[in-house]
């Protein structure tokens, strides 16, 4: 594949006056990027409406599994736009398939001047994984760097081992996707031609080896 230079925006730096982390802060939401918040369900409960409005929240991503639907609910559907994802906090759960739609949802909100809260139950594993994935793809970061960036703002994050593995795999996936999107039709055609040419060369090499072997056998028989 031809080299394509990908360009990413600069990552916002940590605020110098950031609060020192304390245990009760895990029950609150934190602003990870300008306009992007991460927190537990307790930060999106009915009693927290004044706080959500104070921070200008307009969109909410609610991550839960089916058995949690009775108590983790989109409480303000008339006030905020919701994206509800049914995902279990299970290492074998496939979360990569949801990354494109969550990125589109967050990007759409931020582009129109809105603010997004991403929450699961505790705001530690599932929701943290999605915020990390968003930062990776938006700013061209590796998993470990995106994790560290989010943890500076919400210290208690701890995606399960299966989610970590998928996030590490996602780096190659999003880079390949963005590279193809940046390539012109001519570049794509050339890349395919190079690939086909390599395959053809290998095929010709094997055919030539077979022909040479046949010649050796014929020579031996005639001798």
Curated annotation (Swiss-Prot):
The modification Phosphoserine is found at residues 184, 193, 201. Residues 28-176 form the Tyrosine-protein phosphatase domain. GO terms for cellular component: cytoplasm; cytosol; nucleoplasm; nucleus. The keyword Nucleus applies. It is found in: Nucleus; Cytoplasm, Cytosol. GO terms for biological process: negative regulation of SCF-dependent proteasomal ubiquitin-dependent catabolic process; regulation of ERK1 and ERK2 cascade. GO terms for molecular function: F-box domain binding. It comes from the Eukaryota. Its main location: nucleus. Coiled coil: none annotated. PROSITE patterns: TYR_PHOSPHATASE_2 (PS50056), TYR_PHOSPHATASE_DUAL (PS50054). Residues 197-223 are annotated as: Disordered. Keywords: Cytoplasm, Nucleus, Phosphoprotein. A motif (Interaction with FBXW7) lies at residues 76-78. Pfam families: DSPc. InterPro entries: Dual-sp_phosphatase_cat-dom, Prot-tyrosine_phosphatase-like, STYX-Interacting_Phosphatase, Tyr_Pase_dom, TYR_PHOSPHATASE_DUAL_dom. Belongs to the protein-tyrosine phosphatase family. Non-receptor class subfamily. Catalytically inactive phosphatase. Acts as a nuclear anchor for MAPK1/MAPK3 (ERK1/ERK2). Modulates cell-fate decisions and cell migration by spatiotemporal regulation of MAPK1/MAPK3 (ERK1/ERK2). By binding to the F-box of FBXW7, prevents the assembly of FBXW7 into the SCF E3 ubiquitin-protein ligase complex, and thereby inhibits degradation of its substrates. Plays a role in spermatogenesis. Interacts with MAPK1; independently of MAPK1 phosphorylation status. Interacts with CARHSP1/Crhsp-24. Interacts (via FQQ motif) with FBXW7 (via F-box domain); the interaction is direct and prevents FBXW7 interaction with SKP1, a component of the SCF(FBXW7) complex. This is Serine/threonine/tyrosine-interacting protein. It comes from Pongo abelii.
